[in-house]
A protein has these predicted regions:
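Alpha-helix capping/helix-boundary segments
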Residues: 9, 41-42, 82, 101, ...
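Signature tryptophan residues that serve as conserved aromatic anchors
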Residues: 12-13, 43, 128
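Active-site neighborhoods of divalent-metal-dependent phosphate/nucleic-acid chemistry enzymes
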Residues: 54-62, 68-115
Length: 128
């Protein structure tokens, strides 16, 4: 299965945080699954670190790509198609970071690893 990690799932995986559900942890750890980290998550982490909302993310904000790769995650860039799909989504979810992740999950046929239940309203598979 192709998994797109929501930003909090990525953070909790890297920090070993118990907030990450057992289902999510097992799916990410499963060598039969391919896990992806979006450029949108790098943007979100770095932005929130810069403005003081994620002080614990200093290590990650400094090298999201390198740390993600070291954990076996594949980088997912944001394409024009992702932008088009994200812009056309119904306004159920207002967060621009999550909207681009939703668009990527739809476009790339990925399940999203997220505790955010509202993502399921977009018809994507959500693991938690």
């Amino acid at each position: 299965m192709r998994l797109l990690l929501d930003t909090h799932a990525l953070m909790w995986w890297l920090l070993g945080d118990d907030a990450l559900s057992a289902t999510a942890r097992n799916a990410i750890a499963d060598p039969g699954n391919d896990s992806f980290v979006s450029a949108a998550s790098a943007w979100e982490i770095t932005t929130k670190y810069r403005i003081g909302k994620l002080p614990q993310a200093a290590f990650l904000a400094a090298d999201v790509a390198g740390i993600a790769a070291a954990h076996g995650f594949t980088e997912l860039s944001i394409s024009i198609r992702h932008g088009q799909v994200g812009g056309s989504l119904p306004g159920i979810h207002k967060d621009p970071f999550d909207r681009i992740l939703i668009a990527q999950a739809i476009t790339e046929d990925m399940a999203i690893v997220s505790r955010d239940a509202i993502l399921g309203a977009y018809g994507i598979v959500r693991l938690w």
